[in-house]
Amino acid sequence: MIEALLVATGGFFGAITRFAISNWFKKRNKTQFPLATFLINITGAFLLGYIIGNGVTTGWQLLLGTGFMGAFTTFSTFKLEAVQLLNRKNISTFLLYLSATYIIGILFAFLGMKLGGI
């Protein structure tokens, strides 16, 4: 039961944080590129890598990794925004968004793990 509570608590704060950051960026950046989701997912990849690399206890992994990072990052919004770019026939931004998110996300997760100690 405590594990579920840790995940739920982390998820609550992760979702609220993503909502706030996403709205802040969208109000200030009027661009075709989905900058808010991109930065949230890259930051989340780095932080999750750092959490895992740091060797934190299972409780902290559940709270911060599964809960907070699981709700903070967003695979579904990433895919939706990519499809919307395609529907608007914005192929160059679509390709940039897809490739940058995957490549930079993996690099930042690796960097987080290295800085965390793995």
Curated annotation (Swiss-Prot):
Keyword set, alphabetical order: Cell membrane, Ion channel, Ion transport, Membrane, Metal-binding, Sodium, Transmembrane, Transmembrane helix, Transport
GO molecular function: fluoride channel activity; fluoride transmembrane transporter activity; metal ion binding
Residues reported in the UniProt entry to bind Na(+): 70, 73
Segments passing through the bilayer: 1-21, 33-53, 55-75, 91-111
Reactions accelerated catalytically: fluoride(in) = fluoride(out)
InterPro entries for this protein: FluC (IPR003691)
tRNA-binding found in the keyword field: no
Chief place where the protein resides: membrane
GO annotation, cellular component aspect: plasma membrane
Pfam families: CRCB (PF02537)
Activity: how regulated: Na(+) is not transported, but it plays an essential structural role and its presence is essential for fluoride channel function.
Subcellular location: Cell membrane
Annotated membrane topology: Multi-pass membrane protein
Statement: the UniProt record of this protein carries the keyword Cell membrane: yes
Function: Fluoride-specific ion channel. Important for reducing fluoride concentration in the cell, thus reducing its toxicity.
PANTHER family: FLUORIDE EXPORT PROTEIN 1-RELATED, FLUORIDE-SPECIFIC ION CHANNEL FLUC 2
Family: Belongs to the fluoride channel Fluc/FEX (TC 1.A.43) family.
Cross-referenced HAMAP family: FluC
Protein name, entry field: Fluoride-specific ion channel FluC 2
Source organism: Bacillus cereus (strain ATCC 14579 / DSM 31 / CCUG 7414 / JCM 2152 / NBRC 15305 / NCIMB 9373 / NCTC 2599 / NRRL B-3711)
This protein's encoding gene: fluC2
